[in-house]
């Protein structure tokens, strides 16, 4: 799983939800703590009035999973559908990070966190659009991406 540095995923325009990664010394994921309304501050970041380490690694749901995981996912979905959907058929959500967290908790899966210092270009707020467009324009100008990115498809 790609572990983004929190400060590289925050919006200048308001709070965001991020899955803060807890890991052992070998960067094996032990838990993802969903943290809501993380906002930039002069000192770094905070959520619900508590400081949050801006150098924490966070999950942006960029998982690298093996084909065998699809079988496990399907089995988990059947259980989810039987238990969760009847009580809340319109809003029940099968969230992969929560499912993976349960597998980690029961020792049925391991996930290596691979740190990336890249920036996450998210559009949580309408006001984020201009900054994202500007960032992609600069990447095109700097040759990070070619202008005709999809021409060979």
Question: Model regions: which residues?
Answer:
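A C-terminal functional module that forms or caps the active site or interfaces directly
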Residues: 74-109
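Residues that scaffold the ATP/ADP-binding catalytic core of kinase and kinase-like folds
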Residues: 32, 72-73, 132
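Glycine-rich loop/turn
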Residues: 45-51, 101-116
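Conserved core of the sugar-phosphate nucleotidyltransferase
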Residues: 1-63, 67
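Alpha-helix/helix-capping structural signal
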Residues: 67-68, 127
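Hydrophobic alpha-helical scaffolding
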Residues: 63, 86-90, 122
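Hydrophobic helical membrane-anchoring modules
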Residues: 107-110, 118-153
């Amino acid at each position: 799983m790609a572990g983004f540095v929190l400060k590289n995923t925050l919006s200048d325009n308001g709070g965001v939800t991020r899955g803060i990664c807890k890991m052992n010394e070998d960067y094996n994921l032990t838990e993802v703590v969903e943290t809501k309304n993380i906002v930039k501050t002069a000192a770094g970041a905070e959520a619900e009035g508590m400081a949050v380490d801006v150098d924490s690694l966070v999950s942006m749901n960029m998982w690298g999973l093996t084909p065998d995981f699809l079988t496990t996912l399907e089995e988990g979905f059947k259980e989810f559908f039987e238990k969760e959907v009847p009580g809340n058929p319109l809003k029940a959500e099968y969230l992969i990070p929560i499912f993976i967290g349960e597998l980690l908790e029961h020792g049925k899966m391991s996930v290596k966190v691979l740190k990336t210092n890249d920036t996450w270009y998210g559009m949580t707020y309408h006001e984020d659009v201009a900054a994202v467009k500007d960032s992609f324009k600069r990447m095109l100008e700097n040759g990070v991406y070619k202008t005709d990115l999809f021409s060979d498809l």
